[in-house]
Regions:
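Intrinsically disordered, low-complexity repeat segments enriched in small/polar residues
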Residues: 6-7, 19, 104
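N-terminal leader/signal peptides at the extreme start of proteins
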Residues: 1-15
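N-terminal single-pass transmembrane signal-anchor helix
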Residues: 12-46
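Short, well-structured segments within or immediately adjacent to enzyme catalytic domains
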Residues: 50-315
């Protein structure tokens, strides 16, 4: 009987403190190995989803272009000078990114959710949840929700309903040649935003929130969409795929980015290039443009002195 009792006591014996500590140490070790891998997998998933959203936005523009002889959507062509729908001069004052995305949202070419990156880190960038479709009344010369509290916003200093930078919409050579369905695989049209004025050194680079969107925290990473609707992921504001400027002499670009007399293009900066008279606005540029550079409704079709510095918000 005594032997049976001792046997039962041995069978009911639990883990010792040492054994529990060993198990906990093993679990901690496994978590230490798995968590970085899980974090990397989640970051990769966000980057891929972000890439898909950039592609969808541009596809929406291309679909809209089918109704406009191949011209990508331009707010000033949707809401023209005068009150007759579809007629009149282009209203250049309307041409900013808030109106661009607001008009596409109002016409159903995009939805509010895909306008904000899944990797967004700026608290001022949020989906437009208040857009009022009932405000759209073409008969009253209203083509998107213009409401101060409900309409689509694109101002990183106050509130932006989009994460993505886009080609400026001002009347320049750039717009004349590329704001249409060109299928140009070397012209950047849309993508993740970058450091202020294309900075690659100094505080404007190292302190930029855009370094935190993808990849690590020390260098810029992002998805860039081209006018043929292909997307590339890279770690430089000088993508090799982007067509370089004509010559290096008047480009203002870093000397180490001059290759065979061609200056590589910074997609977050309005590079000069060697155009006649030192004109700008022929290269790929991606910004978030809060207002038009025009103070009047009509403007020249080749406003190539435009710099954009007063009409763009950063971070």
């Amino acid at each position: 009987m005594r032997n049976t009792h001792m046997k039962n006591r041995n069978q009911n014996k639990g883990f010792t403190l040492v054994e529990l500590l060993v198990v906990m140490a093993i679990i901690a070790l496994l978590l230490g190995l798995l968590l970085p891998a899980l974090a990397k997998a989640r970051a990769t998933a966000r980057q891929v989803k972000d890439q898909t959203q950039v592609k969808q936005i541009h596809q929406g523009w291309l679909t809209a272009a089918n109704d406009s002889q191949g011209i990508l959507p331009l707010p000033g062509e949707i809401n023209r000078v005068g009150a007759v729908p579809g007629r009149g001069d282009i209203d250049e004052i309307q041409n900013n990114h808030g109106n661009l995305h607001g008009s596409m949202l109002g016409r159903g070419y995009v939805n509010a959710q895909i306008m904000v990156s899944p990797a967004e880190i700026n608290a001022k960038v949020i989906p437009c949840a208040t857009y009022n479709m009932n405000m759209i009344k073409p008969a009253s010369d209203v083509y998107w929700d213009p409401g101060a509290g409900t309409g689509f916003k694109a101002d990183l200093l106050i509130q932006s309903n989009t994460s993505y930078s886009t080609m400026p919409l001002d009347p320049t050579t750039r717009r004349k040649t590329e704001w249409k369905n060109t299928s140009n695989s070397r012209f950047a049209i849309l993508g993740n935003r970058g450091p202020k004025a294309g900075a690659v050194t100094g505080d404007d680079y190292t302190n930029s929130k855009t370094l935190l969107i993808h990849g690590g925290t020390k260098e810029w990473d992002g998805n860039i969409g081209y006018n043929d609707n292909h997307i590339e992921y890279g770690r430089t504001s000088y993508p090799e795929n982007v067509k370089p400027l004509a010559q290096a002499a008047c480009s203002g670009g870093p000397a180490d980015l001059v290759i065979s007399t061609l200056s590589q293009d910074n997609i977050f900066k309005n590079d000069t290039g060697c155009q006649t008279g030192g004109k700008k606005n022929v290269d790929s540029v991606l910004w978030i443009q809060k207002t038009s550079s025009n103070t009047t409704s009509t403007g020249t079709t080749t406003l190539d002195i435009y710099s954009g510095s007063d009409f763009v918000t950063w971070d």
